[in-house]
Amino acid sequence: MARDVKKVVLAYSGGLDTSVILKWLQTTYKCEVITFTADLGQGEELEPARKKAQLLGIKDENIFIEDVREEFVAEYVFPMFRANAVYEGLYLLGTSIARPLIAKKQIEIARKMGADAVSHGATGKGNDQVRFELGYYALEPEITVIAPWREWDLTSRTRLLEFAEQHQIPIAKDKRGEAPFSVDANLLHSSSEGKVLEDPAEDAPEYVYQRTISPEAAPDEPTIITIAFDKGDAVAINGEALSPATLLTKLNELGKANGIGRLDLVENRFVGMKSRGVYETPGGTILLAAHRGIESITLDRGAAHLKDELMPRYAELIYNGFWFSPEREMLQAAIDHSQAYVTGEVTVKLYKGNTTVIGRKSPYSLYNQELVTFEEGAVAYDHRDAAGFIKLNALRLRTLGSRARKISE
């Protein structure tokens, strides 16, 4: 039984699935549909989404298309990279970090337009349904959420196509067959899942990779770049100041040309199952290496190690959809505080899939060459001081060793 809904804001891509959802909302809920399409840097022309929505009966004033690339990178990607966040040691969270922004924009439009519901196209098996809906409820606790994939009976590609034809929804010729895999993309990354990728024992076909050339085909000469940071955020490449989105776009181009950022992994979804994904994050891979490089000379050991302890929890919160939670905000405050002196330049070598930091400098560097040199310096390190340091740190180990020997006698 459909709930009483007057207006719904749909996260709309213009593709087959969300176009079917649009019409399904109209026919099932008899409600007014408002579409929101975000330009997150996915590399697609978005005007066709406007035309498709118009064709399906959406009024011009109910069609929202917004370029959110700068906001996405500055307010979501960069804060995450200050934490060096990776999920399960590998995944750079490219899909996860985009969902809170989409949810936020939908809620803003719902308030502006007086809508009482929001809707998304995430399936009932994946993480995205959780990410979207946790965002909705955090920002608008009483909002009605419609998740068509959990409600309708269009459970196969054939049924979707039949519904589309029944309701005169245009279908591109290349969309009539079963897609070999599903793709999600934004300025940070692209992800490919399903179908030909479902067997984790099988190598991903080369045609799956759209954002990077293979490392084997990359140039035989390395590319050397310098990235400047200011308080933990990248601000320039090779001396040229760039906006956040422009900088990430440039890093993507450099990474693509050098075969950088490919990742094939099996991850643990929040909903309980394991899934295999193929990810391409060329610019993000470079950015992470460079950020860790500048932190290596500007962060105190205790702060650096604490950050590394906090990072897995922070990454898990983002992966699971808790961007708007108080615990994520608490961790963010600590992480941001740690970046006060993370300013300087990092030189990186890009070569056949590898990202190597080869130089780093900062006006706030904690690296003291006179302390680490093997030569005698003005600030000499007295080697004899180490004896007492070792003796004190060995005290508990010697005590434990003595007990173990007594027990064994």
Swiss-Prot record:
Organism: Xanthobacter autotrophicus (strain ATCC BAA-1158 / Py2)
Residues engaged in binding L-citrulline: 91, 96, 127, 131, 182, 191, 267, 279
Location in or out of the cell: Cytoplasm
SUPFAM superfamilies xrefs: Adenine nucleotide alpha hydrolases-like, Argininosuccinate synthetase, C-terminal domain
Top-level taxonomic group: Bacteria
Xref: InterPro entries: Arginosuc_syn_C (IPR048268), Arginosuc_syn_N (IPR048267), Arginosuc_synth (IPR001518), Arginosuc_synth_CS (IPR018223), Arginosuc_synth_type_1_subfam (IPR023434), AS_cat/multimer_dom_body (IPR024074), Rossmann-like_a/b/a_fold (IPR014729)
GO CC, one annotated term: cytoplasm
Entry EC no(s): 6.3.4.5
NCBIfam families in alphabetical order: argG, PRK00509.1
Protein name, as recorded: Argininosuccinate synthase
Family: Belongs to the argininosuccinate synthase family. Type 1 subfamily.
Annotated positions binding ATP: 11-19, 38, 121
UniProt entry tagged with the keyword Cytoplasm: yes
